[in-house]
Regions:
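Hydrophobic, small-residue-rich alpha-helical packing segments that form membrane-like cores
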Residues: 1-2
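Acidic, glycine-enriched catalytic cores built around paired aspartates
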Residues: 6-311
Length: 311
């Protein structure tokens, strides 16, 4: 949990893609805000651990911790309960699940991030426990409980048991200081941050050059995919949808013209629905064409920005 708290933006970056931008926050997919769901029982255990006495523990406190707090953690069994499908990172009885990875994505990327941040956290935990034992003359279990208490306090804001789809969670996430990077370009910035580069370098995963190269490749892949989708969408809109709409509109116009020939001035009564459809089709054609033009212009701007960034 502490590892996810410290590197939530990197986890979000690891699952970023053009298609996942459309999926996150809808269609039974978790939101772009990274949070941890552990359930009410484990939350209660962590809340009690948070109140552990600072420093040395009395024999009574140790007994209470081992019997009444740690002892309450249930036997880990295969989970068959509701798993809060709105949570991107959930504990489901015997494991944590990262649910935000796209269906076509290679899971090696997110797994690299998860393994690295957990390894980093375990390393830091060992260093901090040893330092506390040496500086405060504490026993190992006392030092462990003291460090755990600080970790639980520090990472509390990443824990969320509610509905991740609701607007209320977005507001609450802002109050907690959690990131909400809804697009891939925003999310990928974390991959070349000083924090990420230092992490990979310290853990011997990737060098600074390798990290920056991967970021550039992922950004280029995103741009290429969006470019292709934009061009295909523009082609479909202007060369297929609009011509088909005009063809149908012409059929309606011929129908209205025929009704006018038959009914004279009363044709508007009989052709009311057709005339309404003709007007709506004209409105939609204009909307499709103007939005396609706007999309092309934005695509040109994106090309220019990408060229400047590459330079």
């Amino acid at each position: 949990i502490k590892a996810v708290h410290d590197y939530e933006e990197l986890i979000r970056a690891s699952i970023a893609s053009a298609s996942n931008d459309h999926r996150l926050g809808a269609n039974e997919a978790p939101p772009a805000i990274i949070s941890v769901f552990i359930g009410s029982q484990l939350s209660a255990v962590l809340d009690e651990l948070e109140n552990v006495t600072k420093g040395k523990l009395s024999p009574e406190e140790k007994t209470d911790l081992k019997l009444n707090i740690v002892g309450k953690i249930p036997e880990i069994l295969l989970d068959n309960t509701d798993r809060n499908r709105t949570s991107p990172f959930a504990f489901t009885g015997n494991k944590f699940e990262l649910r935000a990875v796209g269906s076509w994505a290679n899971c090696a990327g997110p797994m690299t991030v998860l393994n690295t941040i957990v390894a980093k956290q375990l390393k830091d935990f060992k260093i901090e426990v040893d330092a506390l034992i040496e500086s405060k003359n504490l026993k190992k279990d006392e030092a462990i409980f003291n460090i755990l208490r600080e970790y639980i306090k520090a990472s509390k804001k990443i824990r969320f048991e509610g509905n991740g789809y609701g607007e209320e969670w977005e507001i609450e996430a802002v109050k907690r200081g959690l990131s909400n990077n809804k697009t891939t370009p925003e999310a990928l910035k974390e991959k070349k941050s000083k924090k990420t580069i230092a992490l990979y370098d310290e853990m011997g995963v990737m060098s600074k050059i390798e990290t920056e190269a991967r970021h550039e490749i992922e950004l280029e892949e995103y741009i290429l995919r969006v470019q292709i989708e934009g061009r295909v969408l523009g082609d479909i809109a202007r060369n297929h949808i609009i011509p088909t709409a005009i063809k149908y509109q012409n059929t309606l116009i011929e129908n209205v013209s025929g009704l006018k020939n038959i009914f004279g001035n009363e044709f508007k009564i009989h052709a009311k629905e057709q005339i309404d459809l003709i007007e709506k089709i004209s409105m939609h054609i204009a909307g499709i064409n103007s939005k396609t033009t706007a999309m092309i212009e934005e695509r040109k701007k994106a090309n220019t920005m990408h060229g400047q960034e590459a330079a």
